[in-house]
């Protein structure tokens, strides 16, 4: 595989001194990409038209950063500024953005970092710097439930891509990922700690016989410069491609997170846990990657990519996601503060993944803040600290 640079996109509404900070992971369509800037500009690009960009300014007078955004459908766009999530009507976008506002969702105690809508378009989830996640009922705009469990900023929230499911997962700077059942309870169903998750490589190398020994080994490894960066979780994503016989239902159980220590972890959110974690629901069919791959024996909690900090990211990994048009779901793209975009095959020889090379890479001139995909255009969309949207093809 190779990464090929495509023609970048730039909107006149974005100033030279501005920077892209977030992309909509749930796109308006498979040929579009929506990005947000640090000065409150939201730009929607149709990648089929080289010069076609539609931009509008949100709360332009206050120039507040748009931290996260996602589409509910082709008309409704949610974006987060400060502690408020705003729903916009794309059919009424104006220069100031005010005419497009449908409603506002409040209740967050601090800056909202991530938003997502469930597969049924019935719930909105927003996570914030205070360590909370708020789930809203989109039928009436009311708060459905507040989820508490993290000790640090919650950096990302994502619903499982399964109709009828009320489960979501979150990532945080406390180095933990949590699984929640929004309609059932306000406490997490399952928790993973990136500092002591047992990976496929740990068992393959015979380094670990118990969790206590693993934790001791992690401390001993602190001699490397990379150990000074704890594995804070900066992103979390589920596979968003179409379900097929090649990937269902197992792939719907797998999540990926980018870590502050430069690694990328892939884990099964239905994993029962090595030491007394919540058991997976009885009767769930095990198949495909999640059960037939590295998680099959029930011991391994994750596949850790680029854990040595040399052949992967050499600084914090800031974002990671599954390539949606790859029907087997085994390809992941990650970006980092080291200005590199990496492509991984997490399934191929998963037990050796932490020691293996990325299958493709490209180095940029700026830190990468976020990435998303235009699935129908087969484009990887990258937001860095510039005002220009970078595009790449995976050949």
Name each region found by the language model.
Residues 36-39, 79-83, 126-130, 170-174, ...:
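Conserved strand-to-loop turn within each blade of WD40 beta-propeller repeats
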Residues 17-25, 63-71, 104-117, 152-161, ...:
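Canonical WD40 repeat/beta-propeller blade segments in eukaryotic WD-repeat proteins
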Residues 33, 76-77, 124, 168, ...:
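Hydrophobic beta-strand positions that form the internal "hydrophobic ladder"
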Residues 370-395:
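Blade-level signature of beta-propeller repeat domains, shared across WD40, Kelch, NHL, RCC1
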Residues 42-46, 85-91, 133-137, 157, ...:
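WD40-repeat beta-propellers
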Residues 291-321, 350-375:
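Conserved blade-ending motifs and adjacent loop-strand segments that build the rim/top face
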Residues 29-30, 73-75, 121, 163-165, ...:
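Conserved loop/turn motif of beta-propeller repeat scaffolds
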Residues 9-15, 54-61, 101-107, 143-149, ...:
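Short C-terminal beta-strands that terminate individual repeats in beta-propeller domains
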